[in-house]
UniProtKB/Swiss-Prot annotation:
Catalytic activity as recorded in UniProt: Preferential cleavage of Arg-|-Xaa bonds in small molecule substrates. Highly selective action to release kallidin (lysyl-bradykinin) from kininogen involves hydrolysis of Met-|-Xaa or Leu-|-Xaa
SMART domains linked: Tryp_SPc (SM00020)
UniProt organism field: Mus musculus (Mouse)
Disulphide-bonded residues: 31-173, 50-66, 152-219, 184-198, 209-234
Domain Peptidase S1: 25-258
Protein name: Kallikrein-1
Example of a GO biological process term: proteolysis
Family the UniProt entry places it in: Belongs to the peptidase S1 family. Kallikrein subfamily.
Known glycosylation sites: 102
GO molecular function, one term: serine-type endopeptidase activity
Active-site residue numbers: 65, 120, 213
Length: 261
């Protein structure tokens, strides 16, 4: 099993370490420039770690397993190696993981049937509000359940190869199908709960991967998921990936933002 994160790992020049659980985009394509204006790049110090989602000028949503001790973020980025004047850099004043996420599962261990990665979400409060522009825009929280069979778009700067990780400079997108949770429950030893979504390509070859954690899953134009965890290697046939079901956490998200604004 893999998280879709690089714990303290991915920099512009390479990788220092790999996590027990990872997620990246395999089998995707270069996103159209500025087509994902809510996409956030979350760094630990100066090293890229995870994706994120801009909810409003003050708040970024990401995965709880992306928790670290020193955040900064980039908004409106497309290519890590290009100077993009429209991109915005922000520091983070507060990180609030969901209180029910089991952080102890981040320690390397052999996957167990009782492993439950539910509640894998975290809010980041920006120290300075984002400037909302054509290339930096928030996305709304969902208001209804996604439909099974929907085509969903995941995006991120995670690995584009399933085993020997290689990371793109350009933001990647991949189209995935929203599948019944039963498909993921059959494919994974870990628990698959109602707080998760199952998405992928049952033929294999398309998936999120190491470095995509915390990024968005957009189904029929609506934010529905946060990239969380999945198989290792990525993109295995009949082994879809797991995403945090955002709709189930709308109340916690809204209340947490209101209490900390």
């Amino acid at each position: 099993m893999r998280f879709l994160i690089l714990f303290l790992a991915l920099s512009l020049g390479g990788i220092d370490a790999a996590p027990p659980v990872q997620s990246r985009i395999v089998g995707g394509f270069n996103c159209e420039k500025n087509s994902q204006p809510w996409q956030v790049a979350v760094y630990r110090f100066t090293k890229y770690q995870c994706g994120g989602i801009l909810l409003n000028a003050n708040w970024v949503l990401t995965a709880a397993h992306c928790h670290n001790d020193k955040y900064q973020v980039w908004l409106g980025k497309n290519n890590f190696l290009e100077d993009e004047p429209s991109a915005q850099h922000r520091l983070v004043s507060k990180a609030i993981p969901h209180p029910d996420f089991n952080m102890s599962l981040l320690n390397e261990h052999t996957p167990q049937p009782e492993d439950d990665y539910s509640n894998d979400l975290m809010l980041l409060r920006l120290k300075k509000p984002a400037d909302i522009t054509d290339v930096v825009k928030p996305i709304d929280l969902p208001t209804e359940e996604p439909k099974l069979g929907s085509t969903c778009l995941a995006s991120g700067w995670g690995s584009i190869t399933p085993v020997k990780y290689e990371y793109p400079d350009e933001l990647q997108c991949v189209n995935l199908k929203l599948l019944p949770n039963e498909d993921c429950a059959k494919a994974h030893i870990e628990k698959v709960t109602d707080d998760m979504l199952c998405a992928g390509d049952m033929d294999g070859g398309k998936d999120t991967c190491a470095g995509d954690s915390g990024g968005p899953l957009i189904c029929d134009g609506v934010l529905q998921g946060i990239t969380s965890w999945g198989p290792s290697p990525c993109g295995k046939p009949n082994v879809p990936g797991i995403y945090t079901r955002v709709l189930n956490f709308n109340t916690w998200i809204r209340e947490t933002m209101a209490e900390n604004d």
